[in-house]
Amino acid sequence: MAVGVEPGKTAYNPLYIFGDSGLGKTHLAQAIGMDIKQRHPELQVLYVSMNKFQAQYTTAVLNKEPNDFINFYQMVDVLIIDDIQELSGNKGSTQNAFFNIFNHLHLSGKQLILTSDKRPSELSDINDRLLTRFKWGLAAELTQPDYETKVKIIHNKARSLDGAENIPEEVVAYFAENINGNVREIEG
């Protein structure tokens, strides 16, 4: 909530959201971005996956425009990077470009939001200077939903389906007790 109210002005910069696949990291990061945009319509909020970031950077290098690429990203007020772990193994220019963008935004009081399926300490093949920066703010772990949360998810999903809003509580309880997976598995 604090990130949405005062992006870049809290101790939660960067906000590093991590957890297993299917727990809602991307959804949460996008929701935070939308909240920021609603509260601060004047701010430039950019969401991009790390794979897309890398593809764009590669194209910029091939076109001899890496500085234009970096300048573009340095102009945003809120940068949301999904699946930051995909930066692993890309030693060299892509990590250097991201390092420069990260530093510029952070020093300028801009908000960074990163998602990953790993804790910062579990990332491999990423420069130490980047890993250190990932730990500057708040690392928030998303975990498997508990029973009560599963029940709420099932009820919400049922309400979104025609004719399924009156699902018997015994059925809801059965699913909540027997589905051990992530939110995607609960929603079907």
PLM-predicted stretches and their roles:
Residues 6-9, 34-45:
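Post-Walker A helix-loop "phosphate-sensing" segment adjacent to the P-loop in P-loop NTPases
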Residues 8-29:
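Walker A/P-loop nucleotide-binding motif
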Residues 58-62, 120-136:
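Short regulatory helix/loop adjacent to the ATP-binding pocket of P-loop NTPases
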Residues 42-76, 92:
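Short glycine-rich substrate-engagement loop in P-loop NTPases that contacts/grips substrate
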Residues 47-48, 80-82, 111-117:
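Structural recognition of the conserved hydrophobic beta-strand(s) that form the central parallel beta-sheet
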Residues 165-178:
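Short conserved motifs of the RecA-like P-loop NTPase core
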